[in-house]
Amino acid sequence: MTQLFKRAAVFTDIHFGMRQNSKAHNEDCTAFVKWFCETARKHDCDTAIFMGDWHHHRATVNVSTLNYTVDAVNHISKNFERFFFIPGNHDLYYREKRDLNSVPFLKNLKNVILVNNVYTEGEASLVPWLVGEEWTKMKNLDSRYVFGHFELPSFKMNAMVEMPDHGGLNSGHFPNQEYVFSGHFHLRQQRGNVHYTGNAFPHNFADAWDDDRGMMIMEWGGAPQYIAWPDAPKFRNIELTKLIEDPGKYMDENTFIRITCDADISYEEANYLKETWQDTFNLREINLIPAKKEEHAQDWSGDVHFESVDQIVLTQLAAIESEVIDRQVLIDIYNQLHV
């Protein structure tokens, strides 16, 4: 039996056009794609699989972003025998149907397969963003491996918020698979046979301190191997008193950093530190934030659960149930407000 791949290189959720079509972000995406292809060649990968959310904006694609996209897709196409492209929810004009997507030009590339319907070859299946009642058919898949863009409950949407269960697709709908690999949630995580591989690289402060992103290599019959992109952007939240002990441990040219001023220093001293560290480490971005002061002390007894404002907002957004409102888009917009 002919199988889908011998050794596949896999990545997901790169989101070209993020941050208002930021040139810096699109160039990060381009650099990642080049590293991905180079790493795949070193590991003799014959097949590339992308698991969804190539573009960030579903309704429009900026002309500059489109040029980055075309160059990146062509680069991947030239480096693999076949490139399977699974559209995610961000790649679709309508969340609830797959009639229109933001990458129609893929049809013109002979070795690029746009997976607009469930595609099975040998013992592997590729599944696009599911619409309508398609999720009910997943339990009938008997493929050894499944790759898709799934929104499964009980997995974390980010480091703080767990996806609630709305009674639809869940990990129990994949009883026949050895491995189920998915994009959509950017945090790398695994439960049972389901693996969210983690997206290409951190995108904002919702990803602070979480550098387990990059690519996966999957050899047929083997176990997944994860490789982090060494030049990925890094997002850091840290107290000044901790940072000042060893600045070089936490900062480099790829770092976005927010520093909480938990020491009694003047405005001039804070600015001096900021300018010095910016010049020394060539940081992407640095911000000093005043520490919050408690007006009243209070003794607490019993079990108390604390939630940050971010946790509260993201939990509420995740709980939205609507046929016209895309909660993931709202969450992405909220996360971008922190960059």
Where do the PLM segments sit?
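Active-site environment of divalent metal-dependent phosphoester hydrolases
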Residues: H15-R19, H56-A59, I86-K97, G132-E134, ...
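Beta-strand-turn-beta hairpins that frame and shape the catalytic cleft
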Residues: T2-A9, Y119-L126, L141-Y145, V194, ...
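Conserved catalytic scaffold of divalent metal-dependent phosphoesterases
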Residues: T69, P87, D91-G172, A200
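Conserved beta-sheet core of the metallophosphoesterase superfamily
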Residues: A159-A223
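Divalent metal-coordination and catalytic microenvironments
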Residues: D13, V33, A48, D53, ...
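Accessory, non-catalytic peripheral segments of nucleic-acid enzymes
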Residues: W220-V339
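Short, conserved loop/helix-junction motifs that constitute active-site signature segments
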Residues: I76-N79, K139-D142, S171-N176, Y250-D252
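Core catalytic region of metal-dependent phosphoesterases/phosphodiesterases
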Residues: L4-F5, I14, M18-Y119, H173-Q177
